[in-house]
Amino acid sequence: MEKLSSLLEHVSTVAILGHVRPDGDCVGSCLATWNYITTWFPGVQAQVYLEPVPNIFRFLQGADQICNDQDADICYDLCIVQDCSDTLRPGAFIKYFKTAKKTVCIDHHISNGSFADVNHVFPEVSSTSELIFTLLEEEKITKEIAECIYTGIVHDTGVFQYSSTSARTMNIAGKLMEKGIDFTRIIDETFYTKTYNQNRIMGKALMDSKLYLDGACIASYVTMADMEEFEVLPKHLDGIVSQLRVTKDVELALFLYELEPGRFKLSMRSNNKVNVADIAVTFGGGGHVRAAGADMEGTAEDIIGKICAEAKKQLC
């Protein structure tokens, strides 16, 4: 696929899907696509379908136009699925993918199975938002589109610190800055700023963390009861696994939070040796070499034990 515009020439309706529990790259890339279509293809009706997005992303142009339900029975001419490695990731919104006349997947997960009619998948790229930049004509990237793309890149690179960050990533970030975006505000207010309760729950997670595999792995978890006590939601737990990862001499960081009794969301980060994407796929998840996750059943301790057993094979 050369440019996104080549797919829009003969369509009237477009659905844009991201993944459940949308993060910065998901929200940023989806809204970048939406803004591009609504700005330069006014005759095309475009709709983003996502679960409710974190409030920190509400400043992005079009965030108030995101549809959070799948009640409408619409057969779209084109369905673009972004930042999703398989057909489970969009959740209930996958109905629009299944009924669309043509489907496209734009993604950067190594576990992507190329499930659409057209698949634009590059695992070596830092983020789906970076991919979106390459699919748009630079002269048509408005300040609003640039804000969306920059936000996505910032969040999936950990503010340009993860190994997926490349020279091209930095070059693209510079071009986005030239569009006049308030890049310091985007970084401070969407990545670093935390509420008091977010800091408290992170503090608990760090205090409760334990070392495994002779110090090569650090893990922690929070329960539904913990989230209720600290008055936070799953979307407020961003950053905990990254903070665990920077512990000295740690190779693998695990963070789990309880989705429902007996079921946890697992996030994994590694530094140099462990391919967490391979581990995630083993347990029905997916992701990248250094960042991956899965939904798993069992107690937190049992899940940590299973992950450590797989990681040990790579560390030997």
Model-derived regions: residue spans:
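Hydrophobic helix-and-loop "lid/oligomerization" segment in the mid-to-C-terminal part
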Residues: 2-18, 28-58, 72-78, 158-316
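Short alpha-helices
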Residues: 106-172
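Generic enzyme active-site microenvironment
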Residues: 17, 21, 81, 105-106, ...
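Solvent-exposed alpha-helices and their adjacent loops that cap or buttress functional pockets
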Residues: 71-74, 95-98, 112-113, 141-142, ...
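Hydrophobic/aromatic residues located in beta-strands of well-ordered beta-sheets
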Residues: 46-48, 103, 149
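Short glycine-rich anion-binding loops that position phosphate/pyrophosphate groups of nucleotides
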Residues: 20-22, 84-87, 109-111, 224-225, ...
